[in-house]
Curated annotation (Swiss-Prot):
The record marks N40, E182 as: Could have a critical role in the catalytic mechanism. Involved in the biosynthesis of albonoursin (cyclo[(alpha,beta-dehydro-Phe)-(alpha,beta-dehydro-Leu)]), an antibacterial peptide. It uses activated amino acids in the form of aminoacyl-tRNAs (aa-tRNAs) as substrates to catalyze the ATP-independent formation of cyclodipeptides which are intermediates in diketopiperazine (DKP) biosynthetic pathways. Catalyzes the formation of cyclo(L-Phe-L-Leu) (cFL) as major products from L-L-phenylalanyl-tRNA(Phe) and L-leucyl-tRNA(Leu). It comes from the Bacteria. Belongs to the CDPS family. This is Cyclo(L-leucyl-L-phenylalanyl) synthase. The record marks R98, Y178 as: Could be involved in aa-tRNA binding. Monomer. It comes from Streptomyces noursei (Streptomyces albulus). One of its GO terms (molecular function) is aminoacyltransferase activity. Substrate binds at N40, Y178, V179, L180, A181, E182, Y202. Its EC number is 2.3.2.20. The active site is at S37.
Length: 239
């Protein structure tokens, strides 16, 4: 634990650290990446507040990234018109930004440790682009990594908001665009955020985190990359 951070209550959250390397990196407390999925009902005001309070007392810096890319493509695949999809995405993102602002207010003096950006903003940075080149190449050249990404696509599509009207080729294309946009954050968040080490924090173990947290050959996570599943105690107990 770094200077300035003190042992803190768990804020009702339970951690599951994925792998021995992640455990060592997690102990440093240098940087956390919190990914927020727009439209995901898990990220209620209550859960988001608990998550940010938990991170604010455990990490020197925390980047919060909310995904605002390729959401409209999924809605269009569901049968919405382009105009309907655009309006729906705008409403969803407006509500999400409001919840994030309120959640940051709850962390008090720790708010200065946080930076909030959309994925589309992050995509404009040279650091993200450099890592994206590597993950795109790995998707084409490393069959096992590609399989993990495809498993993630199916998970995204099957758990999308809405009525679940079935899975089409359009859904899978939209899901792949969504997952490949996120892949740099899974594989090398230290590189994307220019930090020595980073802990990716999410409420479930995804196909990509499960794969990269164990991979020792071929395309691997960056040396300073760690993974933690963190969620409210009552949800962890029910899992």
């Amino acid at each position: 634990m770094l200077a300035g951070l003190v042992p803190a209550p768990d804020h009702g959250m339970r951690e599951e650290i994925l792998g021995d390397r992640s455990r060592l990196i997690r102990q440093r407390g240098e940087h956390a990446l919190i990914g927020i999925s727009a439209g995901n009902s898990y990220f209620s005001q209550k859960n988001t507040v608990m998550l940010l309070q938990w991170a604010g007392q455990r990490f020197e810096r925390t980047d919060v990234v909310y995904v605002d890319t390729h959401i409209d493509e999924m809605l269009i695949a569901d049968g919405r018109s382009a105009q309907e999809a655009e309006r729906s995405v705008k409403r969803t993102l407006k509500d999400l930004r409001r919840r994030l602002r309120r959640s940051l207010e709850s962390v008090g003096d720790h708010a200065e440790r946080f930076r909030v950006r959309s994925l589309s903003e992050l995509q404009e940075t040279p650091e993200y682009r450099a890592v994206r080149e590597r993950t795109d190449r790995a998707f084409e050249e490393d069959a096992e990594f590609a399989t993990a990404c495809e498993d993630m696509v199916r998970a995204v599509v099957m758990n999308r908001p809405g009525d679940g009207v079935g899975i089409s080729a359009e859904h899978l294309r939209a899901g792949l665009n969504y997952v490949l946009a996120e892949a740099p954050l899974f594989a090398d968040s230290p590189g994307v955020f220019s930090v020595p080490s980073s802990v990716l924090c999410y409420h479930i173990d995804t196909p990509i985190t499960a794969f990269l947290s164990r991979r020792e050959t071929g395309f691997r996570a960056a040396e300073g990359q760690a993974y933690v599943v963190v969620r409210p105690q009552e949800l962890a107990d029910a899992a």
